[in-house]
Amino acid sequence: MTSFYGLSQDFDFHKPLSIPISIGAYFGDLRPNHFHMGIDYRTNGVEGLNLHSISDGYVSRVRTTPYGYGQVVYINHTNGLTSVYAHCSKFSGKLDSVVNVAKLNQQNNEIELYLDSNAVPLKRGEVFALSGNTGSSTGPHLHFEIRETATDTPLNPLLYGLGNKDIYKPTINSIKVYGLSNEGFIIPKKSKTINVTNGKLATGNTIVLPANFSMVYGTIGIGISGNDPHSTGSCGLYENKITSYNDLLYHTKLNRVSFEETRYINTYKDYSGYKSGLKIHKLFKNTTNQFNSTKTNSTGRLKLYPCDSIPLEIETIDAFSNSYKIKFGLSIESGKMDTTQHFFPETRYWIPNKKYEIHLSNCSLLIDTLSLYEPTKMNLLDKGQNISFGDVNQAIHKPIIISYSKWKSSKYSDKNYFIGYLNGSHYDYCETYIDNNLLKTKALKFGTYKLILDTIKPKITPLNYTNFGFSSKSKILVWTIADNESKLFKYDVYINNEWIPADFEYKTKKLKCTIEKAIQEIYCILIIVSDVCGNENIIETSFP
């Protein structure tokens, strides 16, 4: 039996798309706060291509939402795997009927259904949906995943024969050397970056570090940036190794990533470097890193002294076993060791393995143990309703709980209040809840937060009809709907007093619904839009 790229089983999968395979992103590519959990198939810049079931199975789950994966389908197969198809523009056949019936029964445009094996069975190659650009997609494509059905863990689809055979080697573009604490935390302003061109260091065969990289209470770590070219583009790195004297110091391999551990990307990569546009894979780990794709028990951290010199070899390998190696020496100049004992004084830094409860004038912060990846500057600023804390160039692993104590007013409903995060000049809505009379949110970003009162109803603008009639004979009605304060919650369309399914695209702020009636049969259109703070706007249009 033939295996796919090292697998012991032959998976004879049908391609998800009928066009030639062109891949825009690989499994494991570095993204904000998560690994890319699948592969992105290009669709030639268009929507509406047939999506095929890769094998016999049944639709086990389907969801419609304006955010995230948009319209997404999950298919369970008989081999213990689940395939996922995200950003669909439309469902087809029996699946389309099942979704529409559910929307009508629930009178809700955003639904999630879990189906048994008899609801929508599929054969290998059968079409069940069309490709699209719904949800958080930035352009037409198919985001495709393979998951282990029993655990819902995403697996690398390239290992199942779902990509083009690749003959190109990955490359390393730069090497970065870090000064680290004994715990593996990155010491500010103690690093050196060396460019790599055609397999050669810009510094020759050796990286020479100042004597202060030798630390009594510290270590050294290595990181690399690079890319993996293939026949239709270039993606991120898959497997990385670093050795010295033939001893394996560190090894990572992105075969599978669970949703529970995907945020560990913020310590797998150089997070502050990523914020500035660099994608650096760290070849070492600190004490907060519990990511399971590390294949060695060692930490990858090096202990060197003045005048020390060691040979290093870095190898990066793609999913098709194409390999790229670079060998170089790492040396420390003569001089005095750095004797600093506390690189992160606790008067100015929060430390990852400690718990903090901070009480401010109108709110409190709860930072649990291991909420942080790295020691983080406090940067506390208390202005009552507005607070700022932490370092925007550092990430948060477990949410920091913000609790406002003074927020209620007898003049307004409790629902009218929310906590916002400053994003540029606008405050983004944060999921807000009430607990023991405290207004709370779970913060996953450092920065500025504010207690906000929202009494403004959402805006609704019809685009192809007015009180005087319809501007075209189109069977699709279109509105723009927006909420500039908090966040849209629900949107309902009634035609002739009958609830009609509608689709909202938050990127364009357009709400669309397809009408089955003839234009001349419509005598009333009612649209109701509400936000998460309970504000509601209703527009009713009657036609003669």
Regions found by a protein language model. Give the residues of each.
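Exoplasmic/lumenal beta-rich domain surfaces
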Residues: 82-118, 185, 190-211, 241-303, ...
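Short, solvent-exposed loop/turn segments at the edges of extracellular beta-sandwich modules
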Residues: 317-322, 530-535
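Surface-exposed, short loops/turns at beta-strand junctions within beta-sandwich domains
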Residues: 303-309, 443-445, 515-522
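Surface-exposed, glycine-biased beta-strand/turn segments
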Residues: 7-82, 89-91, 109-118, 123-124, ...
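Contiguous beta-strand segments within globular domains
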Residues: 197-242, 394-403, 469-485
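Conserved structural position at the C-terminal beta-strand
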Residues: 226, 316, 527-529
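Proteolytic cleavage junctions
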Residues: 344-358, 394, 409-416, 420-481, ...
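Proteolytic processing hotspots in large secreted/extracellular or virion-associated proteins
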Residues: 338-340, 345-349, 374-418
